[in-house]
């Protein structure tokens, strides 16, 4: 009697193993992708970054002594004169005044880092520089490489310099909120966290996940933001809602308070310029655009556009929500299109389900001359982690450029397909599953693998950053963190990294 029972058990186990192996056979063929073949921006300024760090080390012992204070005052005054010069007339993007202003902002970084008492003035300088450059850009062709490079160096570069200083702030005085331009608007409004928010405003943010870092860093002009949402303010109640698209839920409407309660490392408020011809003709146009987005979200289910196809509005990624709404009213946002051109990065993203690499990236909306920056909020407590996530992602993408494939263990595919089946079932019931609606199990496992590798490298970088601070007495700047991350890649992925990523995914 025992032999037949043993035989049945062995046959059952053998059948299960065979079935598991059959489910481990990949079904997806090679992805058809569209490469825009643009040039990826590169700073190529490593010597400058380490020179600035050496200068900071030299200035730290002086702190805010009278000589240092006088030097800072003179440098700030010189920079403010340059900002006024920029605002005094029309300039071409290649004008020398912009290079001088960029050099001044970077040179001030070590000085303010060593004497943070003037941090508030440095924040105002960087904010005023951004506003002046954006005013100049109203006359520029933002699709020209020279224009994109100039705006990027001053806006992204200025923010990077400022945040390095903020991280070294020994006084703990770095403010979370930096107000910029109070662009006039006639649409309904509300106030939250010290900022007046109008209907039709755009909220550009950075999430706390690994994929958020990939979205921010992965395009031809690496950025700071990973998500865009649109604000609707009810004209009767002044209650604000946010219309946004997320990978698992698609397009949805949330109260503004719920939006802010979700993990946000930074948020920037953008508003259309009041002097745009379309807004002069109809000052309520932004509110009408918000109403269009709100109606679309409430009347039909719009899944997330995983392929990033700009022309498919039956599915929408986050940027398409405001873009499509404003487009219906004659406002075409993202005057400068975003591109991802590096073959290695394209290979990784295509493994995650992306098929189109010319799109509307959240970070690039800041460079659109049609919008003003109203305010920028950073979480001071997570700013360092934001930078760590960036350098880990950048190091991983450098591996991608050296033909390092993004893979996962073959035996995980059956499990991924079971989770996908569960996700399809709960989507049919009107709920969100762990795998987005249009994402395959194979793509989901590539995402999980990216998250797991990121988690493993990040752990090593953080350990090295602690050693650096103990050794040098200050927080490792981003270029040092990137060095740590680069040295931490290429190791075998640990099961602990997979489990940590899986917990976050579920």
PLM features: residue spans?
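Cysteine-nucleophile amide-bond enzymes
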Residues: 2-506
């Amino acid at each position: 009697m025992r032999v037949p029972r043993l035989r049945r058990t062995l046959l059952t186990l053998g059948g299960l193993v065979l079935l598991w192996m059959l489910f481990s056979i990949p079904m997806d063929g090679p992805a058809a992708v569209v490469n825009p073949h643009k040039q990826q921006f590169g700073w190529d300024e490593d010597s400058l970054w380490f020179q600035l760090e050496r200068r900071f080390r030299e200035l730290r012992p002086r702190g805010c002594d009278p000589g240092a204070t006088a030097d800072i005052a003179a440098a700030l005054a010189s920079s403010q004169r340059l900002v006024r010069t920029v605002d005094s007339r029309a300039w071409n993007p290649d004008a020398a005044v912009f290079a001088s202003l960029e050099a001044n902002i970077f040179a001030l970084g070590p000085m303010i880092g060593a004497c943070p008492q003037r941090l508030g003035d440095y924040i105002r300088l960087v904010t005023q520089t951004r506003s002046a450059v954006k005013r100049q850009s109203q006359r520029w062709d933002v699709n020209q490489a020279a224009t994109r490079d100039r705006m990027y160096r001053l806006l992204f570069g200025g923010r990077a310099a400022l945040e390095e200083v903020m991280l070294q702030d020994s006084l703990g005085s770095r403010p979370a909120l930096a107000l910029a331009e109070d662009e006039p608007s006639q649409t309904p409004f509300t106030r939250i966290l010290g900022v007046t928010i109008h209907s039709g405003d755009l909220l550009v943010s950075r999430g706390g996940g690994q994929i958020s870092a990939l979205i921010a860093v992965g395009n031809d002009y690496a950025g700071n933001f990973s998500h865009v949402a649109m604000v609707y303010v009810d004209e009767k109640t002044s209650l604000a809602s946010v219309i946004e698209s997320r990978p698992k839920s698609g397009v949805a409407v949330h109260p503004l308070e719920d939006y802010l309660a979700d993990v946000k490392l930074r948020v920037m408020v953008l508003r259309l310029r009041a002097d745009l011809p379309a807004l002069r003709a109809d000052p309520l146009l932004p509110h009408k655009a918000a109403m269009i987005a709100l109606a679309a979200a409430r009347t039909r289910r719009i899944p997330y556009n995983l392929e990033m196809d700009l022309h498919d509005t039956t599915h929408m990624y986050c940027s398409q929500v405001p873009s499509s709404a404003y487009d219906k009213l004659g406002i075409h946002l993202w005057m400068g299109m975003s591109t991802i051109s590096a073959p290695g990065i394209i290979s990784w993203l295509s493994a995650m389900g992306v098929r189109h690499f010319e799109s509307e990236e959240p970070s690039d909306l800041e460079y659109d001359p049609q919008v003003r920056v109203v305010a920028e909020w950073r979480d001071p407590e997570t700013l360092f982690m934001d930078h760590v996530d960036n350098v880990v992602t950048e190091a991983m993408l450098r591996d991608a450029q050296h033909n390092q494939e993004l893979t996962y263990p073959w035996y995980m595919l059956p499990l991924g397909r079971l989770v996908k089946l569960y996700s399809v079932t709960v989507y049919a019931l009107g709920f969100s599953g762990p795998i987005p609606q249009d994402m395959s199990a194979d793509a989901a496992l590539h995402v999980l693998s990216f998250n797991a590798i990121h988690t493993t490298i990040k752990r090593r970088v953080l350990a090295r950053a602690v050693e650096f601070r103990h050794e040098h007495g200050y927080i490792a700047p981003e270029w040092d963190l990137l060095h740590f991350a680069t040295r931490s890649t290429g190791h075998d992925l640990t099961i602990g990294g997979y489990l940590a990523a899986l917990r976050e995914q579920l």
